[in-house]
Amino acid sequence: MKRLLLIGCFCLMGWISLANHILIPMDNTQSNHLKAYGVVYHTLKKGLEVQWLLNYRGGSFILPFDADGRTECLLKGVGFEVIPPARLNAILAEIASPEVNADAVKLEKAPKIAVYSPKEKKPWDDAVTLALTYAEIPYDVVYDSEILDGCLKEYDWLHLHHEDFTGQMGKFYRNYRHMDWYKAEETTNKQTARKYGFSKISELKKAVVRTIRDYVSAGHPSRVYVCDVFGYRYFRYCFGCDGGRYL
């Protein structure tokens, strides 16, 4: 009799797991937003679908109930709720209402991410790589040589930030032109320019921007994020249009 009860309990737990979902809120109730993104990423890596609820509780996520996912949330301090089918249907119905500015977007693939940044920088020197490292989301650092060698076709997502694409090296010239790190960066850029047949750093940077433009124009399913005001303006000028999104 005890054996039958035990088997029945396991079957019931399995049925509940299949029926329920995990809601990861991204509003002020969330205790660790960056780690939450990491949980979502690793859920996608396992081949599971995720629903991104735009404008619902800060852009929350719905994950299939998965024991490993639940454990990951607990270990990483990510706030979550286990919700039954009725609650999920109510949330989706609320989002679908024409009176509500919200939507549910299905996520099916964990993107392969590249961050445009000098190789000599450490993850903690850069806000983007620091955030991705903390969230435990894998990424590759790429720079001018990799882009000109055609690496972009390997990635779904390219992040650009704090880059002066004019190649004038004037962003820190006044205060830092005598610093060793500034001189080393200038020397490296000049060497890279010569490697690809350019006489000036500005020509190198223009070629990099145009390579990114061609990559996006070819219809690759990627997103390009730009986070530097001046760099964005020059990037847009070379694109001839708003090819990226300015954050």
Where do the protein language model's features map onto the residues?
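A glycine-rich, often tryptophan-bearing local segment used as a flexible ligand/cofactor-contacting loop or short
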Residues: G170-L247
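Aromatic-Pro/Gly-enriched surface loop or interdomain linker
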Residues: Q30, K35-V39, K45-E49, Y56-F65, ...
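Sec-dependent N-terminal signal peptides
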Residues: L4-W15
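Boundary at the C-terminal end of the N-terminal hydrophobic targeting segment
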Residues: I16-H21
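Short amphipathic alpha-helices in soluble, non-transmembrane regions
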Residues: G69-V82
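Stable alpha-helical elements in mature extracytoplasmic
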Residues: A36, G69, W124, V128, ...
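Structural motif
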Residues: L23-P25, W157-H162, R223
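Anion (oxyanion) recognition and catalysis
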Residues: L44-K45, L74, T133, V216-S217
